[in-house]
Amino acid sequence: MRLLWLLLGLLLAAPAWAQERVVNVYNWTDYIDPYAIDQFQKQTGIRVRYDVYDSLETLEAKLLAGNSGYDVVVPTSEPTLSRLVKTGALAPLDRAKIPSWSGLDPALMQRVQSSDPGNVHGAIYLWGTVGLGINPDRIRALAPDAPLDSWDLIFKPEIARRIKPCGITIMDSPNDVIAQALKYLGRSPDSTEAADLKDVETLLMSIRPYIRNFQNGGAVNALAAGDTCVAMTYSGDVIQAAARAQEAARGVQLRYVAPKEGAQLWFDTLAIPKDAPHPEEALAFINFVLQPQIIAGITNQVRYANAVPASDAFIKPDILHDPGIYPPDSLRQAFFTIGPVSSAATRARTRMWSRFKAGN
């Protein structure tokens, strides 16, 4: 009889096991506060399976192939979010199940609409700019008159030549670099005009002899170690590099600059794949992350700005008042976003980029 009751108990418990609630999250490396995941699991009973990627190409390839198994993903507005929206790879977000949506900054959400019309598929997670990480002391030692607040540090050959010995690094990202070069030349960052692109290629080729490295995430370590003195990279990467340099106490002083000529704004968004196996849990996760105290904890952890103004009350003062993380309005007026790039334009830019990297 006891065996019978035991078997019945196991049978009754089986559905509970089968119905365990989970959410599969796919995000950048080191891009969330572990406390947020812990609290979400405790408060909702939903288990988080968390995977990471190191490139947007990896994320996009998995989603376009279908059946990725992920419920929440974090595509950057351009170029990834716009392409995923166009290909139908993302599910519309049910805002009725995301009450925290009302706390998002409407001005910032408006900027994402060129990638996601109507903000149907993505909510801003974190944002920042593409600018310059600099080591002022090493730059001044080589070029005392070099403007530390200008893209001239990279794009003006006579200046780049002088600071070459301390190392110049730029992003290995044709869209980002070409858009910034267009802006530097006074053209539209989205221009596909042949004449504009020819001028960009001429500019890039003029500085090619002075570029030491093309890298993305590697700029953090290069800056922190003092292996490069100028790096075109993401704002948060420089903030992280500065923190590492300070911990190492080797005399490396770093600063992030959003140059006066203008810097590109980027937005990472929370989205749900159209074939997500747990869409309800995904909505619950997004709603939780966008709560002011939770997103503030994430900002404090990873040192990137968020789009929830009410979170300011919970952000560490040194982060909230760091112009490299939360730029003042006077700088924001010169910021720009890039729009979707056609397949033909992408191919043309890729060919130009290959010639630039090869130096011919």
Q: Residues of each region from the PLM?
A:
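Periplasmic solute-binding protein
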Residues: 81-89, 116-147, 176-185, 265-271
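Bacterial N-terminal signal peptides
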Residues: 2-14
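Mature extracytoplasmic/periplasmic domains
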Residues: 268, 273-333
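Ligand-binding pocket segment of bilobal, Venus flytrap-like solute-binding proteins
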Residues: 166-181, 185-255
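Conserved C-terminal helix/tail region of periplasmic/extracytoplasmic solute-binding proteins
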Residues: 221, 329-360
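Short beta-strand->loop
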Residues: 91-102, 152, 248-264, 273-276
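Early extracytoplasmic/lumenal segment of secretory-pathway proteins
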Residues: 19-84
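A structural signal for short loop-to-beta-strand junctions that line the ligand-binding cleft
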Residues: 69-73, 91-136
